C-alpha cells in the first residue's frame, strides 16, 4: 500500500522533470492562448513547488501508514502465519521456471547501466555548466539563466539526453552493433507512444474547434463573470476546483486526457479573474494524483488488488478502497494546505512563474 500510494502521489510530485510536466505545460499553453496568444507555460512552471511537495507527501504517507494502515493490516492478516513463498513475487528455489533468467541482469547489462549512469551525470553537469557559466551562448537576455533556451525548450534537451543515454547503453551492452539497429529500437519505443499520439490528435482537433467556435472565450467570460458576481474567497475557489478534478478523475484516469478536456475552460476562466495558468495547472495536479489510488477505473488499481490478494486472499475492491482512501484524503488535504501556505507566502511555483494574471 505504501508503494501504491507513493507512486500515485509521486506521479505529479517528481523530483525530476518528466513527460508529465511537458504534456501539461503544452496543454496549458494552448488553453491560455484563448486569452493571450503570446502566453507560454514552461515545463518548469511548477518545479520549485513540486520538489518540496515530494517530501511533504512522503511524510504524509509515512504518517498514515504508521498511525492507521499498520494496525489495519494486522487486523486483516496474521503476519505470524504468512506463507512467504506464496506471498512473494519470486519463485521458490526448488521450482524452476523459464522466465527466471529474463528477470536477472547479465554482467554486460549491469556494466551498461553503470556506464550510462555516469554518462547521464556527465550530461547533467554539462547542462548546468552551459546554463549558469557566465558568457555561455545559451544564456537568455541579460545573461538570465531562467530565460535560456535550455529552459524554455527543455523538451528537446530531455529528448537528446535520453537518445544519447540509450545509444551509450546499446553500444556498451552490444545490443546496438550497427547504425541500422538505432531506427529499429526507435520504432519499437514509439509503440508505447502511439496511443498518446492518437489522443493528442483528437485533443488538437478539440482545441481547434473550441477556438474556431469561440466557445472557449464565451465559456471563460461567462464563468469569470459568475465567479466575480459570487465573489467567492480564493481558497474556497481553489478547494472546489481540486475536488472537481478529483471527482472527474474517478472516471477519466489519464492525467493528460483529463487536463486536455478541462484546461480550455478553466485556464482562460481563471486568467480572467486574475489567476495565472501555472497556478491552475498546479491545482489540477493536486486534485489528480491522490485520486488515482481510489478509482477502480485505473489499471493500477487492479494490479494493486492482485498484489494485495497475495497476502490477503479475501481482499476485494472494498478492502483495497478502505486501505487507499486514508492515503488519498490525507495527501489531498495535506498537499492542498501546503499549497495555500506556499501561495500566500508569495513564493514562485517555478522559475519565472507568475502567481497572478492581470484580471479582465
Language model regions located:
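Hydrophobic alpha-helical transmembrane segments of multi-pass integral membrane proteins
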Residues: 197-206, 210, 229-268, 272-273, ...
Amino acid at each position: 500500500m505504501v508503494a501504491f500510494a507513493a507512486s500515485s502521489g509521486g506521479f505529479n510530485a517528481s523530483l525530476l522533470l518528466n513527460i508529465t510536466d511537458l504534456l501539461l505545460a503544452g496543454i496549458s499553453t494552448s488553453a491560455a492562448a484563448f486569452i493571450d496568444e503570446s502566453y507560454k507555460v514552461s515545463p518548469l512552471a511548477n518545479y520549485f513547488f513540486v520538489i518540496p511537495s515530494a517530501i511533504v507527501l512522503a511524510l504524509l504517507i509515512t504518517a498514515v501508514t504508521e498511525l492507521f494502515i499498520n494496525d489495519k493490516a494486522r487486523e486483516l492478516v496474521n503476519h505470524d502465519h504468512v506463507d512467504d513463498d506464496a506471498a512473494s513475487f519470486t519463485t521458490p528455489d526448488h521450482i524452476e521456471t523459464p522466465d527466471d533468467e529474463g528477470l536477472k541482469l547479465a554482467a554486460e547489462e549491469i556494466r551498461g547501466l553503470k556506464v550510462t549512469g555516469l554518462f547521464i551525470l556527465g550530461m547533467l553537469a554539462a547542462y548546468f555548466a552551459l546554463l549558469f557559466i557566465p558568457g555561455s551562448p545559451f544564456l537568455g537576455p541579460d545573461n538570465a539563466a531562467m530565460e535560456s533556451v535550455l529552459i524554455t525548450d527543455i523538451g528537446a534537451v530531455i529528448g537528446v539526453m535520453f537518445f544519447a543515454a540509450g545509444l551509450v547503453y546499446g553500444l556498451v551492452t552490444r545490443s546496438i552493433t550497427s547504425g541500422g539497429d538505432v531506427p529499429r529500437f526507435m520504432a519499437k519505443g514509439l509503440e508505447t507512444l502511439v496511443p498518446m499520439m492518437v489522443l493528442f490528435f483528437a485533443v488538437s482537433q478539440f482545441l481547434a474547434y473550441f477556438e474556431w467556435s469561440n466557445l472557449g472565450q464565451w465559456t471563460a467570460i461567462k464563468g469569470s463573470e459568475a465567479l466575480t458576481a459570487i465573489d467567492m474567497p480564493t481558497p474556497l475557489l481553489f478547494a472546489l476546483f481540486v475536488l472537481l478534478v478529483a471527482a472527474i478523475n474517478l472516471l477519466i484516469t489519464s492525467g493528460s486526457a483529463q487536463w486536455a478536456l478541462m484546461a480550455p475552460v478553466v485556464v482562460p476562466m481563471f486568467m480572467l479573474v486574475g489567476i495565472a495558468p501555472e497556478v491552475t495547472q498546479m491545482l489540477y495536479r493536486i486534485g489528480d494524483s491522490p485520486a488515482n489510488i481510489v478509482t477502480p477505473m485505473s489499471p493500477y488499481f487492479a494490479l494493486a488488488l492482485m498484489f494485495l490478494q497475495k497476502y490477503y486472499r479475501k481482499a476485494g475492491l472494498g478492502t483495497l478502497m478502505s486501505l487507499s482512501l486514508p492515503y488519498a484524503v490525507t495527501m489531498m488535504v495535506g498537499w492542498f494546505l501546503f499549497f495555500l501556505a506556499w501561495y500566500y507566502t508569495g513564493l514562485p511555483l517555478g522559475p519565472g512563474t507568475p502567481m497572478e494574471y492581470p484580471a479582465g
